[in-house]
Amino acid sequence: MKKFTSKYFHELLVFTKQPTAEMTETYEHKTDIVLAKDGTESRTALRSKPRATYAFKFSEDSNEAQGLYNVFHDKLRDKYAVPVWTQSLKLKENTPEYSTELIFEGKDALYVDWALIDLDVMIYGMAILYESEDNFEVVEVGFRPEWDDLNEYTVVALDIGTKTKKSWPSGTVVMPLRPCYISDKVMQSRRGLTNAYTLTFQVLNNAVLDEDTPETVEDIDVYLTQYLSSENAVRAIDFDSEIDSFDPLLGRFYKRTTWLNNRVGSSMRVVTTNLKEYYDARKRFQRHRGKFRPFWYPSFEDNLKIIEVNNDKIEAIDDGMSDKYKYLYVMRVSTGEPSSFAIISVVRKPDGTMTITLDRTVDIDVNDIQYVSYITYCRMDTDNLSLSWVGNGVSVSNWRIVELAPSTKKLLT
């Protein structure tokens, strides 16, 4: 670890001990809630951006233990500069034909791999060129990344006062640096010659991510990524004491003392497999968690068995669920492109089938239908959310959604 004097954040201790360790990235929002007698609710965001923390676990041998003890004991409340390797990119030369050349010293702009353009480097922030724990360089950033149409690379323009001081090979890791402080305590566990450390950094200037507007229905977001039980997804089983009852058809019910009606809820488990998915998950969570922005979520476990499509009518096997989901209908075709429809009426027949009349013609061949499911009106049921970085591009996050006033609020008129 080395000291670095920043023109924006003054003296910082660059914490480079953990670039391959597990990390849990937590975002904490704060909202004010007003509950009505019927259980409906209104939430107001009290923070414009979430408070972020990074919790690390890493090991060092006994030769490093004494030095680390002195650092943590002496600098417990001092400021650190912590690399965020969950947003790391590769350094490249500014022309493809010279992509294996060195990035020479004195550069005031760096080119990074264009395939992951979401480098979360802040204006008037810091970045680190990292090769090893003892071989790195900190630079201050004057501008956000910009797209270079000529060379198809993302250009990170560095502040004029912090040109590179040495040459770096193409492929060097580039990571954002966040000014942080140790928010609680440092735990040191000794086992033989190995010392395990656990500590949490709180970020002083967390970035507000640019929100991507997803698919919408009636100006309300739709989550079309499947996280519930299926051959491609896993339902989390870490349910807590708030469970009130269980229905195999409807899933879990949640009930709290402030609610006069039950809410249908589902626990989610989101697994990302690369940095791009991880970054997209962070943006999606930020959009819907802190502001408790409602969204539509397809009930993937209720896959309707379609018999025939005729203009604005669908013949399907009666599943007994259509009375519950009166509002919207989602259709997913083999191309992966979803179409959404409002349910006008449902007619059940003695032969065990039903006719669903929709708000417009279904211009899709019945053989081209991949998936049909209802849409429920939901929100995330938490102020906080953690993404646990396991390594090698893999992260895991568990969270829960609940329906908003199910079967009591008419959403379409």
Each language-model region and where it sits:
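Extracellular/virion structural assembly segments
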Residues: 1-413
